[in-house]
């Protein structure tokens, strides 16, 4: 997701005016007029042409531009941005100041991000093909421009000289200045010309190798053939969707959805093992050499940039800071969960022995026997449970939880422009003062032309400007819920409910941020910290109080889930959680080790690591997951641990401050003020320590697994 910003109207109270204030700048602030006029006049022209209705007080957030408007706006963004950078580059060395070096770039960034989002988010959501194409083209142009700006030696020179002056500025401004310097140095501007060329070459090589690894996986056409008897346990609907050969065998591709179904539902051990072996062997001959070269190239890049290895290069600006700390974190959790994992495994092993005799238990049996035990231990019919979660009832329950927890209230905004007829918009207010905090859109249902994933996009970030104006945050929640043939929303599955809570946590995180700089606002925080608020909110999905609030039978919503089902869902949440956590830790450790040891043997590492972490279980015979582990290649290289990291600290926050499962307004307001409001302008560990009154701990995470063990 891409962040954004823009709007130079100061918002007061709960009745914002739609008219935009045009501010005249004089004296030292004259340079800032470039950035201000950038936001004002760009959008004035588009508003006058289209007369589209935006959110009150957010005139630079326009969500329904035509293809031509998108491309025209992209050109204006690039043109005005270039003017601001040119002006900074021309500041005389004897007149360098915060007002003419840092502030113009900060306010340009705050205002231009919302304009950029107006151009780029339609590629994910617009129902019009020409708009999606224009959006993609605009994004490519804007990305290229931003990269070129961060390679400008003339601007870097001015910023670096100003930074060296050590002028007294606020801590948040100092942090922003450091980020500006890093923007340029990430592109090698602090290196010699020879080293800079080496960085460029290595980055190109890394991109090429990463693409090749992923392409090899995408182009893999391996398939297997099974008789109906060999697929015993798979539902008829699944079999009907498989291609059938002339000799009545079913063709099974190695797509993850097919593999997951086999490993979880197939009763035949031999079939499970055959599928697991084939899946783990994918691209073994081609991708292992590619990954080896990729790891080496990333290590060389890190060394050129002054780091011991790539892991420390990747972690330098995250909560974890160093690879050593990540490995210690993973190993501590692993050792704390080992005894519980052994007990869990013995339950699975006993059931397999009863059903299949003395056939050794393999990794390929884990999913199947976890599901079998859960069927025996828990009286949960998730098909029936789905009937208790109508979309609007769940949504109103989430609003109520957040209102009681964070002291905010929601009001639907009607008669605003949207990109599709079922999009909804809401204003968020502080419950006490009535002050407008921000807005969010909901795009909840699948449709043709829409992206296929759930996320929250920041359409505009909070920011304060030198003229006293305040820019308020605007978020967009994208979900993938279904409608039936008559156009009615289908009730949510329980996993959908959890996902909606998670994503709404990001909305709250974005709206409640009050950082002065857009760079530190909303979702623009340390990646290790970003998921903590959402992981925290997920906890309420399993509390009886919440489940009663958000549930109601489809044909009679006055009938919520019964007490026993609510209690069982909480126990089910932690079933076999130790084994599941160890599996995740295994791959996190593999990712961390290959990027912190430039001489790691990819073939031997997983073979030695697997039984060590997985309480003696060896890797599936003949496989090497390194050949089909895309997370370690693109997107999470050296950072696979981050999801677990946030889950652990969210568990600590929930247990320490919200342990009874009911919304605690006092603790919620403290979390809002001490953790969400400051955003990325302060160290996340400092924020959490200040909120908890101590350093975060892993104990609550471990205890939650142990207390609800089978």
UniProtKB/Swiss-Prot annotation:
Pfam families: Peptidase_M3. The active site is at residue 503. GO terms for biological process: proteolysis. The keyword Hydrolase applies. Keywords: Cytoplasm, Hydrolase, Metal-binding, Metalloprotease, Protease, Zinc. Binds 1 zinc ion. Its cofactor is Zn(2+). Its main location: cytoplasm. Zn(2+) binds at residues 502, 506. It is an enzyme of class 3 (hydrolase). It is found in: Cytoplasm. GO terms for molecular function: metal ion binding; metalloendopeptidase activity. It catalyses: Preferential cleavage of bonds with hydrophobic residues at P1, P2 and P3' and a small residue at P1' in substrates of 5 to 15 residues. Its EC number is 3.4.24.15. GO terms for cellular component: cytoplasm. Gene3D superfamilies: Collagenase (Catalytic Domain), Endopeptidase. Chain P, domain 1, Neurolysin, domain 3. Belongs to the peptidase M3 family. Involved in cytoplasmic peptide degradation. This is Probable thimet oligopeptidase. It comes from Arabidopsis thaliana (Mouse-ear cress).
């Amino acid at each position: 997701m891409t962040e954004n910003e823009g709007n130079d109207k100061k918002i007061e109270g709960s009745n914002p005016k739609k008219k935009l204030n045009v501010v005249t700048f004089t004296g030292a602030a004259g340079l800032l007029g470039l950035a201000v006029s950038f936001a004002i006049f760009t959008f004035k022209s588009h508003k006058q042409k289209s007369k589209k209705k935006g959110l009150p007080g957010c005139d630079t957030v326009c969500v329904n531009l035509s293809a031509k408007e998108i491309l025209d706006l992209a050109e204006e963004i690039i043109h005005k941005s270039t003017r601001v950078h040119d002006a900074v580059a021309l500041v005389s060395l004897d007149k360098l100041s915060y007002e003419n070096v840092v502030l113009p770039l900060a306010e340009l960034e705050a205002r231009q991000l919302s304009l950029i989002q107006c151009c780029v988010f339609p590629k994910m959501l617009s129902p019009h093909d020409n708009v999606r194409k224009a959006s993609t083209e605009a994004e490519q142009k804007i990305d290229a421009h931003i990269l070129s700006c961060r390679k400008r030696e003339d601007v870097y020179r001015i910023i670096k000289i100003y930074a060296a002056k050590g002028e007294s500025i606020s801590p948040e401004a100092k942090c922003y200045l450091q980020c500006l310097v890093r923007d340029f140095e990430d592109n090698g501007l602090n290196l010699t010309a020879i080293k800079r060329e080496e960085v460029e070459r290595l980055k190109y090589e890394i991109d090429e190798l990463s693409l090749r690894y992923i392409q090899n996986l995408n182009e893999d056409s391996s398939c297997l053939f099974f008789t109906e008897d060999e697929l015993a346990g798979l539902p008829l609907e699944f079999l009907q969707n498989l291609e059938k050969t002339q000799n009545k065998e079913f063709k099974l591709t190695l797509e993850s959805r097919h593999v997951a179904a086999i490993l979880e539902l197939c009763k035949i051990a031999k079939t499970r093992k055959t599928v697991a072996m084939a899946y783990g062997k994918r691209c073994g001959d081609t991708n292992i050499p590619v990954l080896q070269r990729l790891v080496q190239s990333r290590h060389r890049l890190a060394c050129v940039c002054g780091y011991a290895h790539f892991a420390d290069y990747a972690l330098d600006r995250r909560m974890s800071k160093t690879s050593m700390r990540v490995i210690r974190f993973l190993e501590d959790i692993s050792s704390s969960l080992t005894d519980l994992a052994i007990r869990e495994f013995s339950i699975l092993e006993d059931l397999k022995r009863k059903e299949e005799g003395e056939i050794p238990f393999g990794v390929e049996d884990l999913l199947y026997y976890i599901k079998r035990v859960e069927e025996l231990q828990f009286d949960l019919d998730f098909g029936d449970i789905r009937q208790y979660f109508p979309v609007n009832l769940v949504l109103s329950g989430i609003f109520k939880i957040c209102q009681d927890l964070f002291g905010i209230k929601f009001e639907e905004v009607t008669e605003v422009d949207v990109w599709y007829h079922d999009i909804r918009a809401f204003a968020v207010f502080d419950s006490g003062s009535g002050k407008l905090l921000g807005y969010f859109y909901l795009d909840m249902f699948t449709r043709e032309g829409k992206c296929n994933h759930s996320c929250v996009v920041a359409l505009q970030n909070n920011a304060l400007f030198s003229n006293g104006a305040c820019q308020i945050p605007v978020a967009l929640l994208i979900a993938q819920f279904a409608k039936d043939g008559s156009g009615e929303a289908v009730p949510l599955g329980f996993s959908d409910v959890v996902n909606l809570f998670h994503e709404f946590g990001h909305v709250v995180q974005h709206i409640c941020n009050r950082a002065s700089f857009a760079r530190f606002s909303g979702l623009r925080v340390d990646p290790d910290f970003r998921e903590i608020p959402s992981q925290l909110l997920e906890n309420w999905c399993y509390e009886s109080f919440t489940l009663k609030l958000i549930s109601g039978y489809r044909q009679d919503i006055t009938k919520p889930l019964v007490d026993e089902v609510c209690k069982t869902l909480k126990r089910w949440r932690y079933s076999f959680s130790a084994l599941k956590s160890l599996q995740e830790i295994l791959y996190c450790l593999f990712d961390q080790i290959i990027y912190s040891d430039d001489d790691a043997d990819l073939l031997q590492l997983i073979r030695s690591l697997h039984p060590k972490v997985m309480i003696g279980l060896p890797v599936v015979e003949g496989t090497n997951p390194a050949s089909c582990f895309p997370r370690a290649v693109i997107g999470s290289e050296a950072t696979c641990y981050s999801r677990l990291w946030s889950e652990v600290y969210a568990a600590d926050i929930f247990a320490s401050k919200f342990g009874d499962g009911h919304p605690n307004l006092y603790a919620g307001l403290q979390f809002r003020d001490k953790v969400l409001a400051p955003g990325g302008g302060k160290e996340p560990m400092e924020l959490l320590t200040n909120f908890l009154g101590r350093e975060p701990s892993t104990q609550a995470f471990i205890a939650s697994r142990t207390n609800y063990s089978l």
